[in-house]
Amino acid sequence: MKKILLPILAALLLISGLPVAAADTEAAALKLTGLDKKLTDGNHLTAAECGEIKLSADGEISSLYIIFHSKVQEFTIKSGEKTETVTSEFLHMLTDVSAFKSSELTVDFGGAKISDIYAFAAGSLPDFVQKWEKPLQRADILLNSSHSDDDQLFFAGLLPYYASRGCDIQVVYYTDHKNETRRRHELLNGLWTVGIKYYPVISNFPDYY
């Protein structure tokens, strides 16, 4: 028995001596200067109409996290001779700009109303940054909700429970709260908080009560 245990113990000691891979470095939030205060106040309910704006940060910008106020819109990013057009799909939009390798970017929003703009260096992004994926064609669970708060009020336990178990969950809303900007942001913030990563499907029916 000792002859069997000794080689196993020796192997375990060797493994314990191996270097452990370092954890991902957290992405530093970069300070943006020269912008309207409404774009950096962290308040989704304030907004500024943005045409071409210049972003200047205190470090190389790897990603931009853009919070549209109520409607998504295509925008263009430029730096030097390089230009990229971004087709917005999400109200809370994360965009990779690491290819520009610059601390200064010119972004043309074409008059879109923007609530907030965040800039990050390379690394693991903070939890509040929402990296949405496109809605699923096939899901393990499909949750239909009449209003944006019904999913949290009546299914608040279901969503985090199955999301934590790796289930692909798609949420569908029958009403679009275009007349209530706050609820559109609360909808996304609530889903992200409970572990949903696929962007919700939202119909065009208005909400009346």
Segment roles from a protein language model:
Residues 17-61, 69-70, 74-75, 79-81, ...:
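Disordered, acidic Ser/Thr/Pro-rich linker "stalks" and the adjacent N-terminal cap
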Residues 1-4:
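Positively charged n-region of N-terminal signal peptides that target proteins for export
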Residues 8-16:
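Bacterial N-terminal signal peptides
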Residues 31-41, 47-48, 92-94, 99-209:
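Active-site rim/loop-helix segments in enzyme catalytic domains that contact anionic ligands
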Residues 80-91:
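Solvent-exposed serine/threonine-rich low-complexity stretches and specific carbohydrate-binding patches
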Residues 68-72, 89-94:
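Binuclear metal-dependent hydrolase catalytic cores
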